[in-house]
Amino acid sequence: MAGKDEAEGLEARLLLLPPEAAAEEPTRCGGGDGGGGGRKRKKTYLDVLGVCCSAEVALVERLLAPLDGVRVVSVVVASRTVVVEHDPAAAPESAIVKALNKAGLEASVRAYGSSGVVSRWPSPYIVASGVLLTASFFEWLFPPLQCLAVAAVVAGAPPMVRRGFAAASRLSLDINVLMLIAVAGALCLGDYTEAGAIVFLFTTAEWLETLACTKASAGMSSLMGMLPVKAVIATTGEVVSVRDVRVGDVVAVRAGEIVPVDGVVVDGQSEVDERSLTGESFPVPKQPHSEVWAGTMNFDGYIAVRTTALAENSTVAKMERLVEAAQNSRSKTQRLIDSCAKYYTPAVVVVAAGVALIPALLGADGLEQWWKLALVMLVSACPCALVLSTPVASFCAMLRAARMGIFIKGGDVLESLGEIRAVAFDKTGTITRGEFSIDSFHLVGDHKVEMDHLLYWIASIESKSSHPMAAALVEYAQSKSIQPNPENVGDFRIYPGEGIYGEIHGKHIYIGNRRTLARASSPQSTQEMGEMIKGVSIGYVICDGELAGVFSLSDDCRTGAAEAIRELGSLGIKSVMLTGDSSAAATHAQGQLGGVMEELHSELLPEDKVRLVSGLKARFGPTMMVGDGMNDAAALAAADVGVSMGISGSAAAMETSHATLMSSDVLRVPEAVRLGRCARRTIAVNVAGSVAVKAAVLALAAAWRPVLWAAVLADVGTCLLVVLNSMTLLREEWKGGAKEDGACRATARSLVMRSQLAADSQAPNAADAGAAGREQTNGCRCCPKPGMSPEHSVVIDIRADGERQEERPAEAAVVAKCCGGGGGEGIRCGASKKPTATVVVAKCCGGGGGGEGTRCGASKNPATAAVVAKCCSGGGGEGIGCGASKKPTATAVVAKCCGGGGEGTRCAASKKPATAAVVAKCCGGDGGEGTGCGASKRSPPAEGSCSGGEGGTNGVGRCCTSVKRPTCCDMGAAEVSDSSPETAKDCRNGRCCAKTMNSGEVKG
């Protein structure tokens, strides 16, 4: 299909202005105007449905090149998207759309943040052509109906004709031109039905292919439209454009709003959903000094955020630029296919012309058969399916990776991921958490320096460093009531792989590992220091050439690191640790990992890591390097695939890496490798299928069985199959390789829970005595797996007043079971949405035994008579974010106690003015602590309150309200009846958190 003017690849970037003009920095990312530095520039996204293969890339470029003000054009065939960077005054959007639509490319401007998904219904041209063609099949009943086949051609051909003539006028041979030639040939041969079938099949297949492509690109479009366009200045309440927010401005983010900027929380507390960036499916608690990123969702609290980056430099903006660069890159396989396709089309067209003309010139018999054979070959000259086989699969795989929080910088990287045979891990911040703590700190020498002075100097210098150890030293000094002052530090220097240096108050201070001793010309022996101080990592402080202090630090391995390395081993991949830390620290980390690392290399400089990565490539083959710091940048660039860890990692690591994990979950590494291998298999199937179908059609035609409509169906149908096969990479049920129990442990919020879950995973499946009745899910007490049968859930029978058992539907209750009973951990637990259920109950997330429960809540259910959000933890557990769902039609909504004898936070009943009884039960019982507990507003006011608990002064369990009278029933006891119907109803609808009652006071 592609002619001599075909672009070198499916994606192309065309610079249309001279270098001096093109050097102007873009002022906009993802839609909208930008200003400053010259004329305004705008980036516009267009859905161009007429772009189906590489020939249209050159066509789009030639159409937009003559327009004044157009600077850069990017065409992404896989998603049928054209990105134009232009001056809106000289080249408005309407002019760009008009230029493309003149060629019949069906262009439209994509609204900011929209998905670009086309209508699910076929166009009138397709419908009319199909109806007329179907009617023509009855010509055996009434021969004149054969004319309806010609009418089907006339009805369905206009889009093909517009695009075909536009391409032909620019000397471009695309699929529309080839199909029009085939239709004309069939009409000349008198095969009217076949001509109509060609038009109908081609237009229908193109519509289905467009629908599939736009559906595949919808996720990427939404990813690029996450950033809100407005922000609220906290100090004034003024609503401004995010592009007008400057570094240092404080913006207000209310519950349910998108965070508009990257920054640091300065006021308020909340939970933020970061799945759009990191792929993590649970919210992250935020409090003052926590980092937040633009495009994430603030769940349930107010926070004030001090801006740390401009909108164009935010993480979302960087992601957008990364995505565009990835879409415009081509893999080795794609470049090879494009090169072959460039010669395939002209060669087949020449052969088809020879098949048609030579027999005619020689006066051979059966010319009609020769001409049909030529037409079949002409239709087969379009290599659309072959050309699409690689970019569409790569596009879908990169989109799937982005949903998992893995950003891959192009098709070459994706292919290399599937070939990895060895992985080198940095230790600090990659295998370990990078959250150091100072175990001990000692003065050495003749103690001329006082401890307070030395800590002040160290903290002031380390305040200028971003290394994880620096934060530990600053925190240690602050724990001694010493505040750093980095403004007093002069001549600050960083020595990668060694440490840092700074001058303060006339003192020359070196802080680092034992190499720092040699740099500072300190005569002390590290062996002597090692005998004096014991620790995992040892650091030294040299003041004016003399060793002044020695300290030890500890750092724990990340949860899931050992399992990730075992996963890599199951894939036949070698795992190696490369660290600049001491051999003792490396050995300690290996012990925490259970000895899963096959090689350890310690006390390395950045150049040593590069040398070792090159050695791994020579020994094992394609090698991946995973790191997060400045020291890893060179090794990341040297590896076949360099992977940087986390959005908070160093900028140098993210810039030089080939892929970025937006979270710090090491389990994403084997997921990325599995995805790369799956993408390679998909591409291989696409290429093999495309070639096989072409070969079969040509072989059938050569066997003197040329069927024109079958050739068309094979051509466009193969394109559709290639797209659909590639979209299998987007399936949500596709597993990247992390085991479910390991993923659950990786998301545990406390070290105690991670240790408990890790121990549980190694224990026998039989439940112990303290966990009778608990549900076993591979050692991790997570929510039931999708598709689990109803008998695996406990149904609690809670009926409204007057309801009879026989009136209830077959499935009377939907229950979200506790996520983490008996000391387990529960994440993302909630009742399923079920409009016909009579009762929906969200059970406690984190049952007895100190379990942890997060995001527990009943689902919204308009037809439910009662919705109860049960306690999010019991028996010393911890409940976070527990609340009853908002439900205007419910008879009673009860927010039960958050933390029975443990700690309950942010527990509140939903606001519900029309509710007959709304009760916010006590937050914290049995001496526990309850915070943020309040009853919803209701009229008439409730009577009675209770406080205190059997735990004495251990905490305050404050029962906010009761109904009419403070009568409650025992937690876990049977129902209690009372003379008051309302009180009895209260006790039946939910278990209370008090055991006794005395004069309006309920003892917890």
UniProtKB/Swiss-Prot annotation:
The keyword Cell wall biogenesis/degradation appears for this protein: no
Membrane topology field: Multi-pass membrane protein
Region (Disordered): 931-952
Segments crossing the lipid bilayer: 120-140, 144-164, 171-191, 193-213, 340-360, 371-391, 683-703, 707-727
Disulphide bonds in the chain: none
Record-level Gene Ontology MF annotations: ATP binding; ATP hydrolysis activity; metal ion binding; P-type cadmium transporter activity; P-type zinc transporter activity; transmembrane transporter activity
Recorded catalytic activity of this chain's protein: Zn(2+)(in) + ATP + H2O = Zn(2+)(out) + ADP + phosphate + H(+); Cd(2+)(in) + ATP + H2O = Cd(2+)(out) + ADP + phosphate + H(+)
Domain of life, per lineage: Eukaryota
Reported uses of this protein in biotechnology and industry: Over-expression of HMA3 allows to reduce efficiently cadmium accumulation in the grain and to enhance cadmium tolerance in rice.
Matching InterPro entries: ATPase_P-typ_cyto_dom_N, ATPase_P-typ_P_site, ATPase_P-typ_TM_dom_sf, ATPase_P-typ_transduc_dom_A_sf, Cation_Transport_ATPase_IB, HAD-like_sf, HAD_sf, HMA_dom
UniProt-listed Enzyme Commission number(s): 7.2.2.12, 7.2.2.21
Function (record text): Root-specific cadmium (Cd) transporter that mediates Cd efflux in root vacuoles. Involved in Cd detoxification by sequestrating Cd into root vacuoles and limiting translocation of Cd from the roots to the shoots, and accumulation in grains.
Protein name: Cadmium/zinc-transporting ATPase HMA3
Species this protein is from: Oryza sativa subsp. japonica (Rice)
Name of the encoding gene: HMA3
